[in-house]
Amino acid sequence: MAQAKLAVLCLLAAAACSQQGPRMEWKRVAMDGSRTGVVAVNAENVDTALGAFEDDYIAPNGRHFTDGATPEVAAMLMEVQPKMAHLKKVVGHNARFMDNPRTECDLPIGNLVADALRAKAADYFQVPVEFALTNYGGIRIPMPEGAVTLDDIESMFPFKNYMCLAKLRGSELTRLLEQLAKTPAFQAVSGCRVKVKAHELVEAEVDGAPIDPKRLYNVATIDFLLSGGDGIAVGARAEDVKLTSVLMKDVMLDFISAKEAAGEIIDYQKDGRVVMED
């Protein structure tokens, strides 16, 4: 009933506008609430209604509503600001904006994350790590151009995905790459160069050479991908798995901080490590 009344009111308002002046057009803008968890108010029947909001708010005309929860929320936000100040610490610098549409292979942001994972695993386990794999879905927001803050890193990796190391025989590593070739955008990888045509793996090199089916390869990945996350089960293919308590956000933080300490800027582009053709 309430929705019906709202629809009628909106239609009447539209009719009044058409008689008194130019027609009002609403622009739809995509909103990303990944940083704050805020969800935009939206009507179920967007073609006939603008939506309902059952609370007080600050109107677009700037009028300040003193009733309701708004003043209390504002006071709470002011109170926690000092506790959040550390999140604004600059930890590195990025040469260019890096998005994550998850529909393309060889994304710069994915290359960065996979390289960071591979480097961290090699340092942590003190062994050569020939290949690294992580998922685009675990990278939740783009990396901004210019200064990169701790808040950016925390927001990029909100999930508790932990670094791990798996030992895969070359034959199983090839099958893993064949599985990734069937997906729309492969995934974020490091230490390999692959070519895919019509979602079939046609070429693959790891550690600068064709894959030896009998060789054991050290593969850095995340626990989410060990047992079926995103349809990938690295653990089922592995002869040995080592877990850690190292979160992916810390992997990235260490990598970027080391670059910053060395006076280096993060500068990633597509580099052809994964080529997918129709």
Task: Please give the residue ranges for each predicted region.
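N-terminal, post-signal-peptide region of Sec/Tat-exported proteins
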Residues: 48-95
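Acidic/histidine-rich, surface-exposed loop or edge segments in extracytoplasmic proteins
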Residues: 85-103, 231-238
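N-terminal Sec signal peptide cleavage junction
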Residues: 16-17
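Feature captures C-terminal
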Residues: 21-62, 107, 111-123, 127-278
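Sec-dependent signal peptide recognition
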Residues: 2-9
